[in-house]
Swiss-Prot record:
The chain crosses the membrane at residues 366-388, 392-414. This is Putative neutral sphingomyelinase. The active site is at H318. It is a multi-pass membrane protein.
Length: 434
């Protein structure tokens, strides 16, 4: 029996009167004959380095327990986390929240793990991991990005048996030094690969959501390329009135807590003391989305997971983002007016950056070979010194180890980097040609 228009009106009023981030499941909404369904999502860079201080993260175990309690209390539909580097931390967290989030997945990659994982209240029917072809430099041991093996992880989540959500979570290479950004070609290539991955795997999905720490600010080329090429919307920007963020020259205008800063916030206890005097917080954590076969409407996107209630500690050195979406699956989504930045100029700029990285890789290769030759000369020269034989033996061993690394980096490491940059450049060029 079809419900009357009066009954539908009453049901609609009930839904509108419910508080923000209500805790009803999709199944309950369907039982109430409501066609528009709600989806609540949260993302956080959890900052959980398992190594001991000063390398590891401060208060890691306590903070992770509080994050788990927050997840249980808030009853989100999907949770995306980054920098959960230890698989044992993931297992411990999944056991803590399993009563509410019975479905979860950790994306394994690299030597230390990708740190990326997903928790869901609804069945995860399939997963796919795409490791970025460029992940920094092997000899930058003090950074660690190369050992982590950054990825974008896709989880296909099925809700009520008929709604397919493609949920992506990722963590791109860190910036470290904006004025002398050695990793900019790598991060730009990662941004292009992310956009390509979403673009090709999202076909057929009802809802598409991309979350994570992109390590790029809203005006950066890589972020603008992700939005334009994958046709995604920035949830925070759509929920808050902001000026045009596409001007690199006015970068500082878009920093600060009021502008959605998620990192280096002065109200965070883990922020460096030098950054607490001025609010120069950066917005580098994002919630991106687009409609698939269903119409998706953003209801709100807000900062969350800042300070732990009743404590002077924060959940992480970043803050999280939460969003609430309304999904209308009564009819197939119709294409909206193109509101994205033109794609071609961004691709042309990106190919220039990637080509610059390719040239730098060739130069570095020669540099490392020269260093290897210098090590060989020093080793041979030390053979003519008969004083301190033990000391020179140790020196020769150390020079041999360093020299072998220089040869490996020049012959293998930089060749792999150059080929990955070349592949990214050719992929971009192919799109430009078409």
């Amino acid at each position: 029996m079809e419900p009357s228009s009066e009954q539908e009106s009453q049901e609609s009023q009930k839904v509108d009167m419910e508080p923000v981030f209500r805790r009803e499941s999709f199944a309950a909404l369907r039982r109430n004959n409501v066609a528009a369904r709600q989806l609540r999502v949260v993302t956080l860079n959890a900052w959980c380095l398992p190594q001991p201080w000063p390398i590891g993260s401060t208060d890691r175990v306590h903070r992770l327990n509080k994050i788990g309690q927050y997840m249980i209390d808030e009853l989100y539909d999907i949770v995306g986390l980054q920098e959960l580097w230890s698989y044992y931390d993931f297992v411990r967290l999944s056991e803590q929240v399993s009563s509410v989030y019975p479905y979860f997945h950790y994306f394994h990659s690299g030597f230390t793990g990708s740190g990326v994982c997903v928790f869901s209240r609804h069945p995860i029917v399939s997963t796919l991991t795409n490791r970025y072809s460029l992940n920094g430099f092997a000899h930058h041991i003090h950074r660690g990005d190369w050992f982590g093996g950054k990825v974008v992880g896709l989880t296909e989540i099925e809700i009520d048996g008929d709604l397919r959500v493609n949920f992506y979570t990722t963590h791109l290479h860190a910036e470290y030094d904006r004025e002398n950004d050695l990793y900019l070609p790598h991060r730009t290539a990662q941004a292009f690969e992310l956009a390509q991955f979403v673009r090709h795997t999202a076909r057929g999905a009802d809802v598409v959501i991309v979350t994570g720490d992109l390590n790029m600010e809203p005006c950066d080329l890589g972020f603008r390329l992700i939005l334009s090429h994958a046709k995604l919307f920035d949830a925070w920007r759509m929920s808050h009135e902001v000026e045009n963020e596409d001007s690199e020259g006015e970068l500082l205008k878009f920093r600060g807590i009021a502008k959605g800063g998620t990192c280096d916030r002065p109200d965070n206890c883990y922020t460096k003391r030098a950054l607490k005097n001025v609010d120069d917080s950066k917005r580098i954590d994002y919630m991106l989305f687009k409609s698939g076969r269903c119409n998706v409407k953003l209801e709100e996107c807000e900062i969350t997971l800042n300070q732990i209630p009743g404590e002077d500690l924060n959940y992480s050195d970043h803050v999280g983002l939460r969003a609430r979406f309304t999904i209308d699956d009564r009819f197939r989504h119709e294409k909206s007016v193109n509101t994205w930045e033109p794609n071609r100029p961004l691709l042309i700029e990106a190919i220039g950056l990637v080509a610059g990285g390719e040239r730098r890789a060739r130069t570095d290769r020669i540099f490392f070979f020269i260093l290897a030759v210098i090590c060989l000369i020093l080793i041979l020269g030390s053979l003519f010194f008969e004083v301190f034989p033990m000391g020179f033996a140790v020196l020769r061993f150390a020079l041999t180890v360093v020299g072998v690394f220089f040869v490996w980096q020049g012959l293998i490491g930089l060749t792999l980097e150059r080929k990955a940059l070349k592949a990214a450049k050719q992929a971009i060029q192919q799109i430009l040609n078409n």
